[in-house]
Amino acid sequence: MYNPAHPGRILVNYLQGRSVTEVARHLGITRPALSRVLNGKARISADMALRISEAFNTDAEFWLRLQAQRDLWFASRKRRAKVKPLAQDLAA
């Protein structure tokens, strides 16, 4: 698996010359909040995914999947205790 791009890097392409301030106002969020997403400093929340999907005529699930892929990639690289599989005794 590779290091998936932050959804904010993809969102930048949707701005199409619009200012961050203009898009933030349109989304109903602050400019710093949008800047954090665009710069990869903040995650895409469900609320943000809905706002983006409505503004750019995309699916909220698309944005959430991008975020989930990135989250899983980072989580898979963290050290954590091994988890043993649960016994699956269906004969009982």
Where are these regions (language model features)?
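A short, Lys/Arg-rich alpha-helix, primarily the initiator
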Residues: 1-19, 61, 65
